[in-house]
A protein has these predicted regions:
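Glycine-rich phosphate/adenosyl-contacting loop at the front of the ribokinase-like
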Residues: 2-92, 113-116, 133-135, 290, ...
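Active-site metal-binding loops of divalent metal-dependent hydrolases
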Residues: 23, 185, 305
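Conserved N-terminal subdomain of the carbohydrate kinase-like
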Residues: 66-154, 181, 350-362
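Catalytic-core regions built around general acid/base machinery
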Residues: 166-178, 200-207
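A short helix->loop->beta-strand "cap" motif at the edges of active sites that frequently abuts
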Residues: 173-180, 255-259
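Conserved phosphate/ATP/ADP-binding segment of small-molecule kinases
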Residues: 191-283
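Conserved post-catalytic alpha-helical subdomain immediately downstream of the catalytic base
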Residues: 290-356, 360
Length: 362
C-alpha cells in the first residue's frame, strides 16, 4: 500500500502521533445499576484524547499523550494504564501538592443505560491538576518536535482558561511546524455554554486539517448580519446526503485549509441497540458510509473510536470509501468493548466488520 497521501501532501508511513487532554478516573456501578443504588464502583481510566491515543497505539501507531496528573497513586496508576497499552507518556507532567492550588485527578461517574433507559454521566473535574497548571512553563515547540500529527478536542478548552490558552498555542505551534492537525469539537454542555464553545472552536478552525463533527462552530450566512442565521440551522441530526454535502461545501468555502471533514450519525433504537453511519468530505467529494447496527455493551468512547479509526485509515492511505467505513466499523466495535477506549489490536476484525464478515475465525 502506498503511504504518500496526496491530500495531506506528505508521507504517512511511520508517522508519530501526539494528543493532549485530561485523563480521568471513571467510576461505574456494576450490572447496569443506577448511581443511587450503587454500593460499589468499577474503576477504570478514560478521557477523549487519551482514548484516541490508546486506540491508535493498540493498532500499532506510535502514539504519545500529554497531560497533567497529580504525583500520587491515582495519577501514577493512570500513567501506568496508558503505558500498558503502548502509549508513550514521556511528556506527562506529575505535579506535587505545592506546585498547583489543587492536586487531584479529574473523575467522572457513569451510570450505564439499558433498554429504554439512557446512560448518564456526572463529572467531578473542577480544580483538577490540569486546570490549575501554568502551561507557560511548557516549551510547546520542543514538546511537538519530531511529531507528525496532533489531535485536539473541544473538551479540554472547556475545563479552564489555562486550558483554552494551551489549546490555541498548540494549534499555532503545530501549524508553524507543519504537523497535520485533527480537531473534534466534542461539545459538553456540563462544562461550558453553547455560545462559549462555538466562539472558541470556530477560532480553532483556521489551524485544522481534519475536522471531526460539524458542531459547535459558527458558519454564518452573513458575517456582518448574524440574524440571517447559520448555514447549519435546521439541518436534522440525521441528514440526507444532499443536506450534508451542502454543509460540507460551506465549510470548505469558508475554511479552504480543511482537507477532510467527517461526522458520524447515530440512530438510537433503544439504550442498548443503535445504528451508525457517517459522512465524509475528502478530495473534493462527499462520501456516505454503510449503516452498521449493533447491540451496546458500553457506548462511552464511540466517537473517539470513530476519530481514531479515521486517523488510522488516513495514516495508512486507505481509499476514501474504505476510510469512512473503517472509521464507523471502529466505532461499532468499541460499543462491544467495556471501558472508555477501543482496545483492539486486530485490524482485521475491524476490516471484517467493515466488509460485513461475521464468520467465526478459527
Amino acid at each position: 500500500m502506498e503511504h504518500f497521501n496526496p491530500i495531506l501532501g506528505k508521507e504517512t508511513a511511520g508517522q508519530k502521533f501526539i494528543t493532549c487532554g485530561e485523563i480521568m478516573l471513571r467510576l461505574t456501578p456494576p450490572n447496569y445499576e443506577k448511581l443511587r443504588m450503587a454500593s460499589n464502583f468499577e474503576a477504570s481510566y478514560g478521557g477523549s484524547e487519551a482514548n484516541i491515543a490508546l486506540a491508535l497505539a493498540n493498532l500499532g501507531v506510535d502514539s504519545t499523550f500529554f497531560s497533567v496528573v497529580p504525583n500520587n497513586s491515582l495519577g501514577k496508576s493512570a500513567v501506568r494504564w496508558l503505558r500498558s497499552n503502548d502509549v508513550h507518556c514521556t511528556p506527562m507532567i506529575l505535579t506535587e501538592p505545592n506546585e498547583t492550588p489543587s492536586n487531584r485527578l479529574g473523575t467522572y461517574y457513569l451510570e450505564t443505560g439499558y433498554g429504554i433507559r439512557p446512560s448518564k454521566v456526572i463529572y467531578d473535574r473542577k480544580h483538577s491538576a490540569i486546570t490549575e497548571y501554568d502551561f507557560s512553563q511548557v516549551d510547546l515547540d520542543a514538546l511537538l518536535e519530531g511529531f507528525d500529527w496532533l489531535h485536539l478536542s473541544g473538551i479540554t478548552p472547556a475545563l479552564a482558561p489555562n486550558c483554552r490558552g494551551l489549546i490555541i498555542d498548540m494549534l499555532k505551534v503545530a501549524k508553524k511546524k507543519g504537523l497535520t492537525v485533527s480537531f473534534d469539537g466534542n461539545f459538553r454542555s456540563t462544562l461550558w455554554t453553547w455560545d462559549e464553545a462555538r466562539d472558541f472552536c470556530t477560532e480553532c478552525l483556521p489551524y485544522v486539517d481534519v475536522l471531526l463533527g460539524i458542531e459547535p462552530y459558527h458558519l454564518w450566512k452573513d458575517e456582518n448580519d448574524h440574524s440571517k442565521g447559520d448555514w447549519k440551522d435546521g439541518v436534522p441530526l440525521q441528514p440526507s446526503y444532499e443536506q450534508q454535502d451542502e454543509i460540507f461545501q460551506h465549510f470548505i468555502e469558508r475554511y479552504p485549509n480543511l482537507k477532510c471533514i467527517a461526522r458520524h450519525v447515530r440512530y438510537a433504537h433503544s439504550g442498548s441497540e443503535n445504528s451508525l453511519k457517517a459522512f465524509m468530505w475528502y478530495d473534493g467529494h462527499t462520501f456516505e458510509s454503510k449503516l452498521f447496527t449493533f447491540n451496546i455493551l458500553d457506548r462511552v468512547g464511540g466517537g473517539d473510536a470513530f476519530a481514531s479509526g479515521l486517523i488510522y485509515a488516513m495514516l495508512h492511505n486507505y481509499r476514501a470509501m474504505d476510510m469512512i467505513n473503517f472509521a464507523v466499523a471502529s466505532s461499532a466495535i468499541k460499543h462491544t468493548i467495556h471501558g472508555d477506549a477501543n482496545i483492539t489490536d486486530d485490524v482485521s476484525s475491524i476490516r471484517n466488520l467493515m466488509n460485513m464478515n461475521y464468520d467465526i475465525k478459527r
